[in-house]
Amino acid sequence: MSALDWLTKQPIAHRGLHDLNQQRWENTLPAFDAAAKAGFAIECDVHLTSDGGVVVFHDDDLQRLAGREGRISELTLAQATALHIGGTTDRAPTLREMLDLVDGRVPLVVELKGIEGRDEGLVAAVAAQLRSYKGKAAIMSFDHHLIRRFSTDAAGIPAGLTAEGTRIENFEAHFSMLAHGISFVSYNVHHLPNPFIRFVREKLHMPTISWTVRDAETQRHSDLNVDQITFEGFDPRALVA
């Protein structure tokens, strides 16, 4: 058994178990609570605010989620958490609020969203909060400049590479990240299979997950190539049943 078996034990709800039919928006406390109650692991996204806080929010631009101009990275933590998501009463939560809500009920995968030159301290800030968290949690990122800080600023916390691409230069860049202490990989499901995933899974025995699976057919494809899915918009348990 691997020390990271918990990471792939159950399907991972992408940005929580969001459902616009119920006005439950992504990366909100209701979406995270719904995922935990359903027994799904949770993926969420975090940004660094202008005053060094950590807010749970996917986009840098505010328009899609908050309906206003501006960037999340330009706001203070107080300003960011005052944003109402999708016109609802739900606010953008802090990472601490999210951790307190989930409270170890299910595993967490926290994706760090970097903006090079404006994210100094993000890795350390997230790591500090996760070190005091009693539940299972991991971090990951697309951003190579952040991944290079994982082994120092987030030592001891399971860390992964979020990746995509099917070209040789993509794989070369991904392989270069193996020197920075990553312990799992999350890959675009539509770019599977590929030599990089095959190598880390079969030769390095790293846990592998896919993103983002939205139907049973794609789930079947993912199951042939990686250990677990990150999903949204359907119930992956139906295929198992």
Question: Where on the chain are the PLM-derived regions?
Answer:
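Phosphate-group recognition and catalysis centered on beta-loop-alpha active-site segments
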Residues: 1-241
